[in-house]
Structures are given as C-alpha cells and as structure tokens.
Amino acid sequence: IYGEHFQGRLFYDKKSLKAPALIIVSGSEGRIEKAQNMAQLLSSRGYICLAVAYFGLEGLPKHLERIPLECLVGAKDYLRQHPQVDSERIGIYGRSKGAEFVLAEESLFNDVQCLVLNSPSDVVYEGIKGKWNSHTSSWTHLQKELSYQKFRLRDYLFSKLFRKTFPKDCSARIDVGQIHSPILLLGSTVDEIWDASSAIDDIVSHYKGHYIIFKKYHETGHMLTVAYQPNHRYRKDWRLLMKESKDSWLATIHFFDRH
C-alpha cells in the first residue's frame, strides 16, 4: 500500500465483514518488518491490521527526522475507506519511537477507538540521522516542526552516571490532555534507552479521558517484544523475560478485544 506519506502492508481475512482494524507502528529501526510481525499475529485474531512504515524504505524519508504526522492520518483514512473495516472501531499500537509518534499525532487528531503504547515517551525528541542526532524534530505537522527535546551529551551522561532523569523541556511535552481514547501503557522500570517508566507516570497524570491502565515490568528493558520470541539483548533468566513478554502481549490482546 502506497500512501502519500506512508507505506504499509495489510493483513486480513478476505471473509471479514465490518471487522475492527488496527494500525501497527514500530520504532527507530524503521522499515516495516517489526510492525509487520505484530500485524500478522494480531490479524490472526480477527483484526484487519495495517503495518505502517514511516521511514527507511524507498519512497519514504531515509532517516527518522521531520516525519509528517499526516502519515498516520493517511493510514487511518485508508482503513476508514476499506469496505471490510468497521470505521468506528480503529485502534493503534505504537512502540518506542512509534509510541511517541502515535501519542503526538493523537494529541492533535484524537479520532480512534483505543491506543496501546509500548515503551512510550511523553515528549517529542530530536530526530535521528544515522547514528547521530538530526538537529531537527522527529515530527512535523503541516510541514512545521513540532517542538522537541534536544539531545545533549551532558544530560545523557548525567542520567547514566547518577541514574537520574534529566529535566524535560516543557515545550516538547506532548499534550496528553487532548486525548480521550482508552489507553494501555506498557513499559519497563529498567528501560536502557529512555525513561519509559516516568513517561508512563506523566501520561497517566495528564490524561483526562475515562480509561487508562498501565503495566510496568522489572526484568525486560526497552525491548519488550512479542511473547515466545527469543530476546538475547538481556543477560537474564529467560524465564523471567518470557514471563514479562507474555504478560504484556496478553494485556495487549485483552485490551484490544475489550475496546
């Protein structure tokens, strides 16, 4: 599927009629493979699933910088026009930078049934250009960059040395108060990429909708992946890692089934 601002792959049962739909958005690895893996799994449960790529494929931005929020708007419009989709039952799953992307977009266009955010951020961070910071925002709206938290080596080293979070730039905070869709938040208290745990706390405290739940894990870090898949990133007892990944996956399934 080739949209104006996104590319995607759709997974669904051809016999489906007015089925609920999900948009799957992965993180800073780009391309589509990880989103596609999850879309395939969720489609087996009766959802029409659109795995979305927003950079890293031919025809899309090369790097994670200045990605238009209109990417997700276009993905939602595509699903609403699909004859087999129930346009009133569309949810979004985002993980890592994808969760940040989804939260930023939904703070302006809150028009889906529910959100699952895995290892989220509640601020817009600077973009990534290869292995370096891009000196631009990760996201744009109407071709204008969203205010963003700049990457400063001093802040990063301080957070690692003293195990304290560096202060967030207030102008870069995502306006969570504009979101009223039900939300499930998943994250780790030992996230090695960013402080997803405090982001979850801040999202919960600023949320003004009617239903938000969260689950925090203490063994698995940022890569809280699909259950039953090996996770060699962490040198910990595989049974503890699998228990957490299984719990987060079941929470995701049950949340989407409920909403």
Name every feature range the model reports, one short phrase each.
Residues 190-194, 222-223:
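Acidic catalytic loop of the alpha/beta-hydrolase fold
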Residues 1-17, 240, 244:
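N-terminal cap/lid segment of alpha/beta-hydrolase-fold proteins
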Residues 30-36, 74-143, 162-169, 178, ...:
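Primarily recognizes the serine-hydrolase "nucleophile elbow" in alpha/beta-hydrolase
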Residues 38, 181, 195-206, 229:
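Short alpha-helix in the alpha/beta-hydrolase fold that links the catalytic acid
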Residues 16-19, 24-61, 192-196:
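Short substrate-entry loop that stabilizes the transition state in hydrolases
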Residues 179, 185-187, 191:
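Short beta-strand/loop motif that positions the catalytic acidic residue
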Residues 201-204, 208-259:
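C-terminal catalytic histidine-bearing segment of alpha/beta-hydrolase fold enzymes
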Residues 54-87:
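Catalytic nucleophile-loop/oxyanion-hole region of alpha/beta-hydrolase
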